[in-house]
Amino acid sequence: MTQAAQPFGVTTPSDATRGSSFSLVAQLRTNEASGADRADQIAHQLETAIAVGLIGYGEMLPAERELAAQFGVAVLTLRAALASLRDRGFIQTRRGRGGGSVVCDAGVVTETERRRRLRERSTEDLRDLGDLADSIATTAARLAAARSDHADQTRLQNLADSFRSATSPQDRRKADSRFHIGLAVAAQSNRLTTATVQVQGEMAPLLWASDPAGQLFEFEQAERDHAAILEAIVRGDETAAEAAALQHCLHETEAMINTHLDLVMGESDS
């Protein structure tokens, strides 16, 4: 069997391989950070990793020199990025012996911010994002059905269970993202894993509201979608796994576009 991909983002902070996890963070590129200076780009990459749960609450970031080397920048550039995250409450930094930067925020996007992001995106852009997401997820699901072993499938089941037991919107957002990342891990593809983290970092804050009253994607629907994907993977049915993943992504894309249109039409009526 093919060597399994390192399970980035689906392990807990206590058993994660820190170096490889932060190496993945350094590979992230997001549209929202395009055109920004390097410090702002790094800040956005770290913010994305926090948003999808790749870096967990209370986790210590690597030493500045080590982290700067991961990103291929000078320590001063990294410090500017960390200062931005610190100012916005994502991390706290303790100086001196035994100090360092610790994640102190789960990357919650407020309902006002989420609505602003959805309103400012065009229908075509949201559809394009959905197309990218479903191309990645369907490939991951198909390959997971072909390549995954019992350990991979058990990990996916645990991720699906974590989503089902999540009660807060931010926990659901992170659990949904981790399930998607878990698919890529089960597909045994590091490149798919990197691509999944990137697209989830962009989509998850648009889908999962911080206020349950503003939720645009049904929790029960996502739970059913996850179950259908997992069942097909366990059966080794590549076609069914691919189809189930496509349906899940179509549900997500439809939710984003419908909410965008409601927001735009609401503005035009006011």
Regions found by a protein language model. Name each.
Residues G56-Y57, A68, R119, L143, ...:
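Short, flexible active-site loop motifs that bind/organize anionic cofactors or intermediates
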Residues N31, R38, H44, A49, ...:
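Short leucine-rich amphipathic alpha-helices used at interfaces
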Residues A51, I55, A145, V234:
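Short, locally clustered residues in the helix-turn-helix/winged-helix DNA-binding domain
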Residues L129, A133-A209, D225-A228, A240-E254:
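Conserved amphipathic alpha-helical segments that form helical-bundle/coiled-coil interaction surfaces
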Residues E66, S101, D149, L156, ...:
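Sparse recognition of residues in long alpha-helices and their boundaries
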Residues M1-T139, L263:
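Short linear motifs at protein or domain termini
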Residues P7-G9, S14, H180, G201-S270:
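C-terminal all-alpha effector/ligand-binding and dimerization domain
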